[in-house]
Amino acid sequence: MSDARRYHALPSPFPMKRGGQLQGARLAYETWGRLSPGCDNAVLILTGLSPSAHAASHPDGDTSPGWWEGMLGPGKAIDTDRWYVICVNSLGSDKGSTGPASPDPATGAPYRLSFPELALEDVASAAHDLVKALGIARLACLIGCSMGGMSALAYMLQYEGEVEAHISVDTAPQAQPFAIAIRSLQREAIRLDPNWQDGHYTDAAYPETGMAMARKLGVITYRSAMEWNGRFARIRLDGDQRPDEPFAREFQVESYLEHHAQRFVRRFDPACYLYLTRASDWFDVAEYGEGSVMQGLARIHVRRALVIGVSTDILFPLEQQQQIAEGLQAAGAEVDFVALDSPQGHDAFLVDIENYSAAIGGFLRTL
């Protein structure tokens, strides 16, 4: 199986919004489909916190399923027979793009906490530099999911007139206090792990306990009480599945959280986790509108937009999607707003492919 990732060298130095700069930085990305002669069929996908650029499999390359496998491909909602699709791994991540886990060219050691403060505007700027390098003057559609939806807003705010249509998926124009509080606890769990060592952890002494707790807190917010009740109720583990220690796991829901945590702890770098979650806290469309989200959204000019939210999302509540839809419409866009009742909460866009495909595919077919 060949690696379908490609790498784009960013300008060196690459200036960061909150100060500092990167030398020799790169962006990992993957593409599907073929760019049209007029370069007018490009779709850019900006991801959530942890995904790589591998949104879907490649028949002639990396055939492993991608994180949005059911959404992207020939004849699917995002039809690669029509669209040239680009998915980037966010700047600051650890899935190929330069981030806190990358070696600092000046020292050869990982950046860790010496990495400059990261803003989602930096994520957007890096993606924009790639788009320009590919010869694309204007995106046919910009898709942003979760954190990537905020990065997409940053992209459109910084590069006015360079996006024809936008699909906003389960995102927000700014983080609400609940989301900030949860992410604060996640970072605290990592930093309080003795193996964190102010960012000087190693593979042998790795903050697994802190990462596991951070992931468990995240999973709780990514799903909904409706799903917890429907899947687990109060079902207990069989006796042979319970650890033999006081206050250990007893309910199935506890085992589920532990399973997801253990799958994650070594798959995502702790320092990258801190940087990207804080960048999500900092982003605020109101900064572009003299303190007003609606005035900030008024600076975004696209012809068409689809805004999707889910009623069970507690991390980015549905009213925040409604706010984006109203703001883009007030700025002159023709907006479709879709409110779904999926029980999976914030993660519904990764799970409820049937309903999200219907909305996204239906919208793209009208472009």
UniProtKB/Swiss-Prot annotation:
Protein function = Transfers a succinyl group from succinyl-CoA to L-serine, forming succinyl-L-serine. In vitro, also has homoserine succinyl transferase activity.
Where is it located? Cytoplasm
The UniProt entry, under InterPro entries, shows:
AB_hydrolase_1, AB_hydrolase_fold, HAT_MetX-like
* Gene Ontology MF term list: homoserine O-acetyltransferase activity; homoserine O-succinyltransferase activity; L-serine O-succinyltransferase activity
**Enzyme kind, highest EC tier:** transferase
Give a GO biological-process term: cysteine biosynthetic process from serine
User: What is the similarity comment for this entry?
Assistant: Belongs to the AB hydrolase superfamily. MetX family.
Active-site residue numbers: 146 (nucleophile), 313, 346
What region holds the AB hydrolase-1 domain?
41-351
Residue sites binding substrate per the record? 215, 347
Which keywords fit this entry according to its UniProt record?
A: Acyltransferase, Amino-acid biosynthesis, Cysteine biosynthesis, Cytoplasm, Transferase
Pfam families linked: Abhydrolase_1
Q: Could you describe the subunit structure of this protein?
A: Homodimer.
| Pathway(s) | Amino-acid biosynthesis; L-cysteine biosynthesis; L-cysteine from L-serine: step 1/2
Q: What is its EC number?
A: 2.3.1.-, 2.3.1.46
Q: What's a GO cellular component annotated to this UniProt protein?
A: cytoplasm
* Organism of origin: Frateuria aurantia (strain ATCC 33424 / DSM 6220 / KCTC 2777 / LMG 1558 / NBRC 3245 / NCIMB 13370) (Acetobacter aurantius)
Taxonomically, the superkingdom here is: Bacteria
Residue(s) at site: Important for acyl-CoA specificity: 183
Q: What is this protein called?
A: Serine O-succinyltransferase
Stretch list, region Important for substrate specificity = 48-51
Q: Does the keyword Transferase apply?
A: yes
> Membrane-crossing residues?
none
Q: Which reaction does it catalyse?
A: succinyl-CoA + L-serine = O-succinyl-L-serine + CoA; L-homoserine + succinyl-CoA = O-succinyl-L-homoserine + CoA
